């Protein structure tokens, strides 16, 4: 406790947080999180989200190794496959192919085709 039997701001915040967590359930936190996200999205632009995403990605990459990314990728893939059907994958494959074709030329496809053929021959 701070001087004169007064709580510090930090102590008061911690106690308030503990009390709140005892009095509310998961749905409460989901609801206030959604409201906060909506309010934030109204106040910030695309660049803001790109910047915080980049900073978060850099911080995460410093704290995790290759196995971490393999594990979360596998979990994400499993969750996605449980929630989507064949048509979903056909659609995202088509969109990805279109985007790739806009960004690459004939030489790119010749190079990756050659690499794929070489890899297959080495198996």
Swiss-Prot record:
Disordered: region residues: 1-123
Keyword Repeat among record annotations: yes
Induction statement: Glucose or phosphate starvation, and addition of decoyinine. Also by heat shock, salt stress and oxidative stress.
Superkingdom of origin organism: Bacteria
Ranges of Basic and acidic residues composition bias in the record: 1-29, 41-109
UniProt KW keywords: Repeat, Stress response
Signal peptide as annotated in the record: none
InterPro entries linked to this entry: Stress-induced_KGG_rpt, Stress/Virulence-Domain
Pfam families in the cross-refs: KGG
Residue ranges, annotated region (5 X 20 AA approximate tandem repeats): 13-120
Sequence repeat extents: 13-32, 33-52, 53-72, 73-92, 93-112
Function per UniProt: Involved in an adaptive response to nutrient deprivation other than sporulation.
Domain notes: Consists mostly of well conserved tandem repeats.
Additional information: Glucose deprivation induces sporulation and several other adaptive responses.
Family annotation (PANTHER family): CONIDIATION-SPECIFIC PROTEIN 10 (EUROFUNG), PTHR36569
Protein name in UniProt: Glucose starvation-inducible protein B
Species of provenance: Bacillus subtilis (strain 168)
